[in-house]
Regions:
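Low-complexity, Gly/Pro
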Residues: 1-3, 16, 34, 75-80
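Structural detector for short beta-strands of small beta-barrel domains
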Residues: 2-21, 51, 58
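Short beta-strand segments
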Residues: 5-7, 33-36, 68
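A short, sequence-level motif marking secondary-structure junctions
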Residues: 12-13, 39-44
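OB-fold (S1/OB) nucleic-acid-binding surfaces
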Residues: 21-37
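Short nucleic-acid-contacting surface segments enriched for D/E, G, S/T with interspersed K/R
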Residues: 42-57
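OB-fold/S1-family single-stranded nucleic acid-binding modules
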Residues: 62-80
């Protein structure tokens, strides 16, 4: 399902637990698009790189609310 794509953007936090730990991240692109990061193993690794730029490849789907979700196959943290 979905289409394979590569996006670039800032890794941003989107959900937290009661203690303020980040549970989920998104990639915010220069085009003001937000891609929620699926909670697979690679996606969870991206949480370590909050507020850094990354190039992320994976399958993109749209959920029933119209939000874009990327299931991360591979990623690369970019130098500024």
């Amino acid at each position: 399902e979905g289409r394979l794509a590569t996006i670039r953007g800032l890794v941003t936090p989107v959900t937290w637990d009661d203690k303020g730990n980040v549970l989920a991240a998104a990639i915010s692109t220069h085009f003001e698009e937000e891609y929620l990061v699926d909670d697979n193993a690679r996606g969870e690794e991206l949480i370590a790189f909050l507020r850094q730029r990354a190039k992320v490849s994976g399958f993109i789907i749209q959920n029933e609310n119209g939000k874009k979700i990327i299931s991360v196959e591979k990623y690369e943290v970019l130098e500024d």
